[in-house]
């Protein structure tokens, strides 16, 4: 791996993102921006840092961290830039120090009100080098997805609103060279209001994908055509997509498949809700990772998970057919909160040698306000991940319990424990891990 490749990828994206932010700062008044941030110093003891099955090594890790959340909801600029960076220092030298960062950013500049917007979007995250291996420090890498381009709004007759989007997309991975790509995407949309809370839209999308690295994967063109029906009621939201997708590869191959998506949310009461998502479509890792960042300001504020920041995506640029379903029940009471449900996801890669996989399991989060300044949080997840080509099957179980205490509006602390278990059918990939954790946080 060359130093040039490690530096050049992030440098291009950082320069483009900085240009977009500078443009927005110039266009928006200073008082329109709001900045929240936190500083944290954490100490953890990990009894199996490298997640070894036969030779566990324990260590104590000190982790200073900085998180920020910058927002603007003005008429000319709408933006949310949220991130966290942490530096992990291993006292017993079980592993070298780590600098890890995550960032979600979306910026929309209204160049001509009602006519022309310019969008800049970026996501930096930590993901595994190999999804089949345990989440040890030597199996982590930074990846980045950057997108930018104009959106043009127009009318088609008296009742149909039109929209044209052009995006340049750049993807980069620190170690997985097969993820690096440049893309150009064009979308045309027309939406008609059918009645109160009901909209029907027609969508045409085309994308050119050029993958860096000769022989790693074939470049290809992707085309999507689908109808979207959206219904919003007082206690129920429904969105249905139906259409078709085509993939045309430069090496002469082609694939096609129906595009089906359904998303429903039912607010059963003032405090409870039930949501479900099901889909069958062509996708790829870059698309699935950048989708959570949207123009409606739903970028999650930065938080620090127990242990190291890390994701669970297979990092490559290969397209796959995704079949997935997720059900979530949520409750938000005066003292207690709960969210959880099952999930299932199957990825069938278009390439014969792709890492086809099936994952299913369940996850939940529970919170309880013990007093005005004490809160208990519990997170749990179980998953079975099976790689179809090799037959490798990994069962993982994760449990975390944390007690948060607030001292002043700015100062707080948390202490807790996490347990991670991994049972693999492949020799050497099973492991258990216990982490004890304490942290002091300043929030502004």
Model-derived features with residue positions:
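Gram-negative and organellar
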Residues: 31-444
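Cleavable N-terminal export/targeting peptides
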Residues: 1-34
């Amino acid at each position: 791996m060359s130093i040039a490749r490690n530096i050049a990828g992030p440098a291009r994206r950082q320069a483009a993102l900085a240009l977009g932010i500078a443009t927005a700062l110039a266009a928006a008044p200073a008082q329109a921006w709001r900045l929240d941030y936190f500083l944290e110093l954490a100490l953890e003891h990990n009894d199996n840092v490298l997640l070894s099955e036969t030779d566990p090594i324990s260590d104590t890790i000190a982790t200073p961290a900085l998180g920020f959340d910058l927002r603007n909801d003005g008429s000319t600029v709408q933006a949310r830039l949220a991130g966290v960076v942490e530096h992990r220092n291993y006292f017993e030298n079980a592993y070298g120090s780590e600098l890890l960062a995550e960032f979600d950013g979306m910026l929309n500049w209204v160049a001509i009100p009602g006519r022309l917007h310019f969008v800049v979007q970026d996501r930096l995250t930590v993901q595994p080098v190999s999804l089949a291996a345990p989440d040890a420090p030597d199996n982590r890498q930074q990846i980045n997805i950057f997108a930018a381009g104009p959106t043009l709004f127009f009318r088609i007759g008296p009742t149909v609103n039109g929209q044209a989007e052009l995006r340049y997309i750049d993807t980069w991975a620190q170690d997985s060279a097969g993820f690096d790509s440049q893309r150009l995407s064009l979308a045309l949309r027309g939406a008609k209001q059918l009645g109160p809370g009901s909209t029907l839209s027609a969508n045409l999308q085309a994308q050119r994908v050029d993958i860096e690295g000769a022989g790693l994967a074939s470049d290809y063109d992707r085309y999507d055509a689908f109808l979207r029906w959206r219904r919003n009621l007082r206690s129920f939201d429904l969105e249905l997509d139906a259409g078709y997708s085509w993939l045309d590869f430069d090496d002469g191959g082609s694939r096609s498949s129906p595009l089906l998506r359904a998303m429903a949310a039912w607010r059963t009461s003032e405090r409870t809700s039930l949501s479900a998502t099901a889909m069958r479509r062509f996708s790829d890792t870059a698309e699935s990772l950048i989708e959570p960042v949207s123009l409606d300001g739903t970028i999650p504020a930065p938080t620090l998970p127990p242990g190291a920041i890390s994701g669970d995506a297979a990092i490559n640029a290969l397209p796959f057919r995704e079949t997935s379903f997720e059900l979530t029940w949520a409750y938000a009471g005066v003292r207690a909160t709960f969210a959880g449900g099952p999930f299932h996801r199957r990825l069938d890669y278009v390439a014969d040698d792709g890492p086809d996989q099936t994952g299913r399991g369940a996850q939940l989060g529970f919170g309880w306000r013990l007093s005005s300044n004490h809160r208990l949080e519990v997170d749990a997840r179980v998953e079975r991940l099976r790689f179809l080509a090799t037959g490798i099957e990994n069962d993982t179980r994760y449990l975390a319990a944390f007690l948060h205490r607030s001292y002043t509006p700015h100062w707080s602390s948390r202490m807790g424990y996490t347990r991670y278990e991994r049972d693999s059918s492949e020799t050497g990939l099973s492991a258990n891990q216990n982490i004890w954790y304490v942290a002091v946080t300043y929030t502004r």
